[in-house]
């Protein structure tokens, strides 16, 4: 049934003891197409989202197909399947195993900026707060599953988070600052900033910049001070070099009051002429009625990964 069982989780399951025979619900083969490639092949209904059948779970998971297509997080599919088609062990536990809190947090950190871009929020039903920590309960995470290839990166056994990674090959597709791009992408913020440093922690890269001038802002307050620009992957795209001054155009995470530097953002070496152009472009954008917050997207934006019929533009 298992194609790899974490030793720690197995030991913890054994400590729980076997469920009484009368209460042990039957495990069933995973029939959800998106979850079949995952390292378990048996599940149990109802799942963690209270779907009584896998057919219901399939319909509910369809809304995430577009988000999965963006490759916003390597943990998203694992997390969704652990919620919608949870691992079931016949002998050791009468309740399906939940994903670890750290898995949820990594998936959310990578994909929530994409949802925000299309005026969606991370679903409350997938909140990370109530999920178990790696060292305080039985839970499952990708790095805990033993495979023939071994772990992709060393893990901290105390919390399930990585201690370090190998060099990640980043392929950034440059986006040139033009009026057409500016009007199409409708950035939340535009700043002139000097890069102080680029910090890397596990899969997260953060650029620390000193804001020199604010050309555009939206709902997140931007001080003329040192601020962090957050990414949603282990790559800094567009790339930034320390001690260089840039004009940076990006998006924001209103809920966490964060400025984001994600796919579709622009960073070019600062030139006074370019700064003046951007101010003119923004005036035109406001004249077109796009410079402020637009109505929310239709639900199809989440499913397809593209905006609906509202005026929100795509990158």
Swiss-Prot record:
<dbReference type="GO" id="GO:0002064">
    <property type="term" value="P:epithelial cell development"/>
</dbReference>
<dbReference type="InterPro" id="IPR015526">
    <property type="entry name" value="Frizzled/SFRP"/>
</dbReference>
<dbReference type="InterPro" id="IPR018933">
    <property type="entry name" value="Netrin_module_non-TIMP"/>
</dbReference>
<dbReference type="GO" id="GO:0014033">
    <property type="term" value="P:neural crest cell differentiation"/>
</dbReference>
<dbReference type="GO" id="GO:0030308">
    <property type="term" value="P:negative regulation of cell growth"/>
</dbReference>
<dbReference type="Pfam" id="PF01392">
    <property type="entry name" value="Fz"/>
</dbReference>
<feature type="disulfide bond">
    <location>
        <begin position="27"/>
        <end position="88"/>
    </location>
</feature>
<dbReference type="GO" id="GO:0070367">
    <property type="term" value="P:negative regulation of hepatocyte differentiation"/>
</dbReference>
<comment type="similarity">
    <text>Belongs to the secreted frizzled-related protein (sFRP) family.</text>
</comment>
<feature type="disulfide bond">
    <location>
        <begin position="100"/>
        <end position="139"/>
    </location>
</feature>
<dbReference type="GO" id="GO:0090103">
    <property type="term" value="P:cochlea morphogenesis"/>
</dbReference>
<dbReference type="GO" id="GO:0005615">
    <property type="term" value="C:extracellular space"/>
</dbReference>
<feature type="domain" description="NTR">
    <location>
        <begin position="170"/>
        <end position="290"/>
    </location>
</feature>
<keyword id="KW-0217">Developmental protein</keyword>
<dbReference type="GO" id="GO:0010721">
    <property type="term" value="P:negative regulation of cell development"/>
</dbReference>
<dbReference type="GO" id="GO:0070365">
    <property type="term" value="P:hepatocyte differentiation"/>
</dbReference>
<dbReference type="GO" id="GO:0060070">
    <property type="term" value="P:canonical Wnt signaling pathway"/>
</dbReference>
<feature type="region of interest" description="Disordered">
    <location>
        <begin position="284"/>
        <end position="315"/>
    </location>
</feature>
<feature type="domain" description="FZ">
    <location>
        <begin position="22"/>
        <end position="142"/>
    </location>
</feature>
<keyword id="KW-0964">Secreted</keyword>
<dbReference type="GO" id="GO:0017147">
    <property type="term" value="F:Wnt-protein binding"/>
</dbReference>
<dbReference type="GO" id="GO:0043065">
    <property type="term" value="P:positive regulation of apoptotic process"/>
</dbReference>
<dbReference type="InterPro" id="IPR036790">
    <property type="entry name" value="Frizzled_dom_sf"/>
</dbReference>
<dbReference type="GO" id="GO:0035567">
    <property type="term" value="P:non-canonical Wnt signaling pathway"/>
</dbReference>
<keyword id="KW-0732">Signal</keyword>
<dbReference type="GO" id="GO:0008285">
    <property type="term" value="P:negative regulation of cell population proliferation"/>
</dbReference>
<protein>
    <recommendedName>
        <fullName>Secreted frizzled-related protein 3</fullName>
    </recommendedName>
</protein>
<dbReference type="InterPro" id="IPR020067">
    <property type="entry name" value="Frizzled_dom"/>
</dbReference>
<dbReference type="GO" id="GO:0061053">
    <property type="term" value="P:somite development"/>
</dbReference>
<feature type="signal peptide">
    <location>
        <begin position="1"/>
        <end position="21"/>
    </location>
</feature>
<feature type="disulfide bond">
    <location>
        <begin position="104"/>
        <end position="128"/>
    </location>
</feature>
<keyword id="KW-0325">Glycoprotein</keyword>
<keyword id="KW-0221">Differentiation</keyword>
<dbReference type="InterPro" id="IPR041759">
    <property type="entry name" value="SFRP3_CRD"/>
</dbReference>
<feature type="glycosylation site" description="N-linked (GlcNAc...) asparagine">
    <location>
        <position position="41"/>
    </location>
</feature>
<dbReference type="Pfam" id="PF01759">
    <property type="entry name" value="NTR"/>
</dbReference>
<feature type="disulfide bond">
    <location>
        <begin position="35"/>
        <end position="81"/>
    </location>
</feature>
<dbReference type="InterPro" id="IPR035813">
    <property type="entry name" value="NTR_Sfrp3"/>
</dbReference>
<dbReference type="GO" id="GO:0061037">
    <property type="term" value="P:negative regulation of cartilage development"/>
</dbReference>
<keyword id="KW-1015">Disulfide bond</keyword>
<dbReference type="GO" id="GO:0030178">
    <property type="term" value="P:negative regulation of Wnt signaling pathway"/>
</dbReference>
<keyword id="KW-0879">Wnt signaling pathway</keyword>
